[in-house]
Swiss-Prot record:
Protein name: Small ribosomal subunit protein bS20
GO cellular component terms attached to this protein's record: cytosol; small ribosomal subunit
Any Pfam family: Ribosomal_S20p
GO biological process: translation
GO terms of molecular function: small ribosomal subunit rRNA binding; structural constituent of ribosome
Keyword check for Methyltransferase: no
Biological role: Binds directly to 16S ribosomal RNA.
Classification via NCBIfam families: S20 (TIGR00029)
Family in the record: Belongs to the bacterial ribosomal protein bS20 family.
Coiled-coil regions listed in the entry: none
Keywords: Ribonucleoprotein, Ribosomal protein, RNA-binding, rRNA-binding
Length: 92
């Protein structure tokens, strides 16, 4: 337990930031799961791309506030679009 005033404040601030980061990461992961689920269910390319836009936005927002690193955001987006392209390339 911190005794110094600034240390007490840091505990509060870090807990608040942890919860904010957790919310952004959860939103990001859920949107990615929706895209992957749509691929498994065989949804149309338009529907999947619409879900991808939502996921891309969630990933970028998480990176913007620092919940994830910008390189991780880039990697997640590129891997997700690669899966989408691979899925629809095999269908054609």
């Amino acid at each position: 337990m911190p005794n110094i005033k600034s240390a007490k404040k840091r505990v509060k601030v870090s807990e608040r930031n942890r919860l904010i980061n957790k919310a952004y990461k959860t939103r990001m992961k859920n949107s990615i799961k929706k895209v992957l689920l749509a691929l498994q269910e065989g949804k149309s390319r338009e529907e999947v791309e619409q879900l991808y836009k939502v996921a891309q936005s969630a990933i970028d927002k998480a990176a913007k506030i620092g919940a994830i690193h910008k390189n991780q955001a880039s990697r997640r987006k590129s891997r997700l679009i690669a899966k989408i392209n691979k899925h629809f390339a095999s269908k054609e």
